[in-house]
């Protein structure tokens, strides 16, 4: 029997949009929007400090020269995930049956007022491992950064928020969240963060600066997700304009962009992540949001 769940988040944000703009935002015709194929991979224990350490990561020298993680690894993320998920490297506690990678289709569009981002992927087989997050079988999040003010954001995407002393890393403080070194919303050194949680039926809009904050952003209009058979699709709608802690999006500009999926009731570092990419709004980018 085909299981179909429809989960809608962001009701409060949508009501605010209704009050301010007179109508709910209408999603674009996704059949007319080009999809970018991006393979997420299981990263294990590979924090920012590791990718900068030349004795352990051969790409550290290239990183220092200004090359991006995607320049070297975009075609091998699935293979990287296999090595790490198996415990061959960078994972001291491998989970039997853990999916090494998740291929995702990403689509983007805008209507002059709102940005629409759609993610779709097939549900990997369950590992059978203990559930880390009982409430949420799936979570998906993406981050945006503007201007490369966060060190290495232009090269490493969201990796600048991932540190060896953050919770769920070996020997780390369980209370320490993601953060940016020298992070400051006032100085523009932050990531704009969006997340959708399946079980809680909620969308969140926060930021990562000196610590991660899951709420307080004002750009999110709605987050809607559904599972149709073995396929998930999640659509985020956010205003192009933003308040404090939000990245304001402008036509003709590109932004640092990365995303991650917590699958199989996972939590913390046990997610699948993208490399760093560019989101272009009427501009060049790995993912392009054209006006519809």
What are these model-predicted stretches?
Residues 123-130, 244-245:
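Short amphipathic, basic-aromatic surface patches that mediate peripheral association
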Residues 223-230, 246-251:
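Exposed beta-sheet edge/beta-hairpin loop segments within beta-rich domains
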Residues 1-24:
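Gram-negative bacterial Sec-dependent N-terminal signal peptides
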Residues 113-123, 232-238:
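Short, well-ordered beta-strand segments enriched in hydrophobic/aromatic residues
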Residues 25-56, 70, 78, 141-195, ...:
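Acidic/polar low-complexity flexible segments
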Residues 62-77, 101:
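C-type cytochrome heme c attachment motif
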Residues 81-98:
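Short cysteine/histidine-rich metal-coordination sites, predominantly Zn2+-binding motifs
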Residues 174-226:
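Short helix-loop boundary/capping segments
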